[in-house]
Amino acid sequence: MELKQDFYYSEDHEWINTTPDEAAGKTVRVGITHVAADRLGEVVFAELPQVGDTVTAGETCGEIESTKSVSDLYSPVTGTVTAVNEDIDGAYEAINNDPYGEGWLFEVEVEEVGPLMTADEYASSNGV
């Protein structure tokens, strides 16, 4: 699986679906990278923030549980959660099979963007 070239990535393996410059004041979609999904193994549960919650860039906002481990979920942006992907509730395989599409996790109306990398920078720092 390849990284989406038009997405931006955090060092904690989350992505947003737009550029940092375009994100401020807009709603962005957030998910985990295929690198994180591969390392986790089969995802069996996701505890996500709720609509109306405030998330902060670089801070935990949920957990992803797999057959191997439980990992914290970090927000790559600061803002208010506007939507949660209800389609993955009970169908967590989408996180593994299509992390950049059907496996998205939540949407945030962005107040501030955390430090993010281009696809090439993320790939280089993670040996992808």
Residue spans of the language-model regions?
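Acidic, low-complexity mobile loops and tails
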Residues: 1-60, 93-128
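Conserved hydrophobic positions within beta-strands
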Residues: 13, 64, 73, 78-81
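Residue-level recognition of beta-strand microenvironments
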Residues: 16-19, 67, 84-87
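A short beta-strand motif that forms part of the nucleic acid-binding face
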Residues: 34, 68, 77
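Short, charged/polar surface micro-motifs in flexible loops or helix N-caps
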Residues: 37-38, 78-81, 87-88
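Short, Lys/Arg- and Gly-enriched loop/turn segments at beta-strand edges
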Residues: 63-74, 91-94
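Charged, alpha-helix-enriched surfaces in structured cytosolic catalytic cores
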Residues: 76, 90, 117
